[in-house]
Amino acid sequence: MAGLDLSLVLMLSVLAGVREVSLTQVNQQGVIAPGDIIIGGLFPIHEAAEAVNFTGLNSFSSFQHPVCNRYYTKGLNQALAMIHAVEMANQSPMLSSLNLTLGYRIYDTCSDVTTALWAVQDLTRPYSYCDSQTNSSQPVQPIMAVIGPSSSEISIAVARELNLLMIPQISYASTATILSDKSRFPAFMRTVPNDEYQTHAMVQLLKDNKWTWVGIIITDGDYGRSAMESFVKHTEREGICVAFKVILPDSLADEQKLNIHINETVDIIEKNTKVNVVVSFAKSSQMKLLYEGLRSRNVPKNKVWVASDNWSTSKNILKDVNLSDIGNILGFTFKSGNVTAFLQYLKDLKFGSEAKMNNSFLEEFLKLPEIGNAANAVQEQIKNTHLDMVFSVQMAVSAIAKAVVELCVERQCKTPSAIQPWELLKQLRNVTFEKEGVMYNFDANGDINLGYDVCLWDDDESEKNDIIAEYYPSNSSFTFTRKNLSNIENVLSKCSDSCQPGEYKKTAEGQHTCCYECLACAENQYSNHTDADTCSKCDTESLWSNANSSKCYPKFYEYFEWNSGFAIALLTLAALGILLLISMSALFFWQRNSLVVKAAGGPLCHLILFSLLGSFISVIFFVGEPSNESCRVRQVIFGLSFTLCVSCILVKSLKILLAFQMNLELKELLRKLYKPYVIVCMCMGLQVTICTLWLTLHRPFIEKVVQPKSILLECNEGSDLMFGLMLGYIVLLALICFTFAYKGRKLPQKYNEAKFITFGMLIYLMAWVIFIPVHVTTSGKYVPAVEVVVILISNYGILSCHFLPKCYIIIFKKEYNTKDAFLKNVFEYARKSSENIRGLSGTDPHSKTDNSVYVISNPSLVPEEKQVSVPEIDNVL
């Protein structure tokens, strides 16, 4: 930019030194119309200029001056739009009521900065040499405003000179963002939005169509570089990557250099096979050459070309190529209004000798080979009408006309220098003008932002294109007017294929973020949309997912379920046990007076059966979804019921030991201690105390154990110590029972209750000894089943050893269920025991004492447990 400023200073110095050089001498063309207020116009009547040596006057013997070539019909069309707009304004009541007219002086910029500055120099000096016939000088009015130029590059250079005189400049097509900076360009205004809106709209279009791998082509200069900078800024923000950036030379004069750049650009496009969308801010003539180069290459024909306003309506590009050769072209154009009057003006325009005299641009236009006659000239102008450009020019003229009227209402503006350019500039910044019934005004940056139309090119030679969408900067959104766009929507422009749900993108270091590989999400992570940057984590407290998952799944609650086959089997065994208990209880109640029932404990049998019922019922609370209540109830019910059972068995063991104890002293002691219900209550009381402390201090509770795919619901015993005390206490009672029963293991064969108690307690002890390591090492939902199995083994062990033999005698061996059979069995047992003792002591086994008690003469030779007497029947029964 500093280099451009220096060039401008040098150029102004040169221009200041050659004020005497006439326009005719430097081949400068123009169109002039008189008026009270003069407006300057700068339009690209030619597309290029090349410098040639020119012999000047005075101190400058020679210097380089550009000569224009490559006639640009669209530029003439824009100049005619200004002429028509001025004529319409002069005919309006707004100006005619003040008896004012607008005049103009229009010059050709030749699409060249230097040529444009020559024109500005001529516009801003008090005298002009425009009469090519007489070369005479005549005083002219100073210009009050300038309309144009179209190119941002040229507008920037022109604006810097006009800023010095504060002459308002209104461009109808310059969109460079830098021109909105009022601190640098205070006199510049425009009737189009700046490129910041256009690049944002383009990126929004790319984003909406998921085109993330694109290329950009610009023409070198302030406009192109500013547009590329703005475009890249927006793409980075939206995650879109630019695969390549091509900068074509600004000058069109050096065709050899231009062709080299065009061929290099074709190579780049051909190499980037995955880039199917290209955004271009280049000149239309350069795009024409590019398309001609692509036509002969092996380049996919389904590309989408996004055209900036710089060439979006220049359909002369398709003169030698078809859309089928290059793809689809989407063009961004400025929104326009009704320009029917201008089209009619072109039809009515006379292209005779009078027109040639007043307009040198028309004179050259009519000499073009493709024109030939006036009819062709009209058709060519209509074909090259850019509706958006025409409307923008008309708005610029309307704004100036309205501002002039507002200034001249209270002053005589027909007097020269009645108003100054800076006054008009100030008025323009605040003016509100009407066109086609719509009110317009400039914003704080001096811009009028109407938005954009998005057009889709077709092969029709007319300049009209199919408008498919409208873009509104106020809400950064598109409104599509055409729904069927499959040929556009089906185009893919991505560096990498989309990652599917369940995958995420991983970009290698140093690569574009749009070039990546797709990796599967890990376990307990997911991605639920395509092209996810990262995988989201599942809430592992309640959710889970497999690898490569697109969503999280709720964890199911896991517990020892009712419908589990194992649970059904255990519950069936518990139910059978309850049926057995009920049956045995009924049988024992019916035979309550029989010797077998009395010998088995009488009322204690029913108490044992009741306790076993509670133990079987506790199994139910180990199955199903646990709760705090079930966790507490199940252990307490089992603990208390089995304590009651073992306590009753302990009483039975003491009774048997008392009945068959032959040691009189020990027998007397046992008789004093034998208080059945007191013993049962004491044993139960201690267990109740343990359970109460447990439930009070460290009560069991439900615990949720988070597992990879489920949540295990299990009972936490609260205190392993209290749980161990409860079970340990029962084990202690069982050991005592086992000890007592073991001492009476050799009782009468048909009444060996102690042996059955021994087996029952042995089964219980073995089951619970196995339970401890299994319970500690087992985890999962079947932990409750382990305890249930042990409970059932214990219950069935007691049923089998204590009650089934009695039931067998009652039902099948009724002859043993008599007092005589029972006494016979007992006395036989006592006799054999005495004989064994006498044999050990050397006494005659047939000798008897008077009190019917066998006396051992040398008791020290016999162990204490062998010293027996005839049992008392009452203690047994």
Swiss-Prot record:
Q: What does the tissue specificity note say?
A: Expressed in olfactory epithelium. Also expressed in gills, tongue, lips and palatal organ. Not expressed in brain, kidney, liver, muscle, intestine, ovary and skin. In olfactory epithelium, it is widely expressed over the apical and medial portions of the olfactory sensory neurons, regions that contain olfactory neurons. Expressed in external epithelia, which contains taste buds and solitary chemosensory cells. On gill rakers, it is widely expressed in the surface epithelium, but excluded from taste buds.
Q: Which residues lie on this side of the membrane: Extracellular?
A: 25-567, 625-635, 698-720, 777-782
Q: Which GO terms describe its biological process?
A: sensory perception of smell
Q: What is the effect of changing residue 190 to A?
A: Induces reduction in ligand-affinity
Marked site positions, Important for basic amino acid selectivity: 389
Q: What is its main location?
A: membrane
Give TM regions: 568-588, 604-624, 636-656, 677-697, 721-741, 756-776, 783-803
A Pfam family assignment: NCD3G
Alphabetized SUPFAM superfamilies for the sequence: Periplasmic binding protein-like I
* Family in the record: Belongs to the G-protein coupled receptor 3 family.
Instruction: Tell me, in a sentence or two, what this protein's role is.
Output: Olfactory receptor that is activated by amino acids that act as potent odorants in fish. Most highly activated by basic amino acids such as L-lysine and L-arginine.
Q: What is this protein called?
A: G-protein coupled receptor family C group 6 member A
Q: Taxonomic classification, please?
A: Eukaryota, Metazoa, Chordata, Craniata, Vertebrata
